């Protein structure tokens, strides 16, 4: 069954839906890419904050995320045919908010240290982990896209200056860290 096979028999406020979904904690990622040279200034880094990231398959290794339809950042990712998912640490809430705002992608990267993944996509320094992918498929799902990526390379930062990294989480409209007990 597909979305087009169903009839929307449940009408409710989208704000209420968002509030209820906010009770489910999610990890915070910044998805990045190097947008191809489209204006003669050379490839440009693009990226946005994504909370809807998930693993999809182990064999083959696939991941997915859901950006909003109409995102100019997504246009750059689609044009590059690759992306890197950066799992943010609890010390990177400023980066989360910076990349969550609409605007010029280049400004998002000012004063943010990064280096290139094998695909050329930016790996943000001090991220908990990064996953470099090629775009496998893109599907429209309501007001969002589902982007499926095939994992080409990945790694985790096992040590932030002698301390294990703590991932950043989003829960009920706020950001915080998570440390496993034991």
What kind of feature is each model-predicted range?
Residues 2-182:
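Basic, polyanion-binding surface patches
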